Amino acid sequence: MATVIKTIGTNGRDYSTITAWEADLDNSDIYAAGDNAVGVCYNDSAFSGSLIIDGGQTIGLNSVTLTVAEGDRHAGTPGTGAILHGNISSYVLTLNSKNSIVEWLEITSPGTPAYRMLYMPWPGHWESRTARHLLIYDNNRGVSNTSQGIYAPFSCTVHNCMVFRLKYP
């Protein structure tokens, strides 16, 4: 069991998008059963769109972690770290791989109201999913009072996250 770390951003990183990194989580040329996959984002790239992290299950990864490089993490205020701009009307980030962690990202969707900013559905297994040290902000849902910040119904841990400026009609 190895920890395989891949960098995400510009300037010679392994991947230019989080989506490209996630698409390779079941790539047997990169990972083996039992590996721990770690994607490290840098604040030198614009990450945008809807992201679903559900890879690694076919190959049998032990865990999947999406994090931000230590020097590029937010300082507790918007715009100070690596940002995932949703700008999509569904889910900005869906965390659906077993034993998965997302941490230190800023998640925002100011342009297009998102249904939910972070969605951690029950994937049919009881392995944990964890969200920590996230900034989730600026979503003007404008439709209903649905839980639009973090939706984490089963087998999830959420800690040290700040959720703010989410608006209802």
Task: Go through the PLM ranges and name each one.
Residues 1-3, 34, 61, 97:
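Sequence-level motif detector for i,i+2 pairs with an aromatic at +2
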Residues 3-41, 46-48:
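Acidic Gly/Asp/Thr-rich repetitive segments characteristic of extracellular carbohydrate-active
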Residues 22, 37-40, 63-65, 105, ...:
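Short Gly/Ser/Thr-biased coil->beta-strand turn/linker motifs
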Residues 30-35, 59-61, 144-145:
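Short helix-terminating capping/connector loops at secondary-structure junctions
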Residues 46-65, 73-103, 108-126:
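Extracellular beta-strand-rich solenoid/capping regions of secreted or surface-exposed proteins
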Residues 67-68, 97-109, 125-141, 153-169:
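Right-handed parallel beta-helix
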Residues 73, 140-143:
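Flexible, glycine-rich phosphate/dinucleotide-binding loops
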Residues 116, 144-150:
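Glycine-centered small-residue motifs that form tight turns
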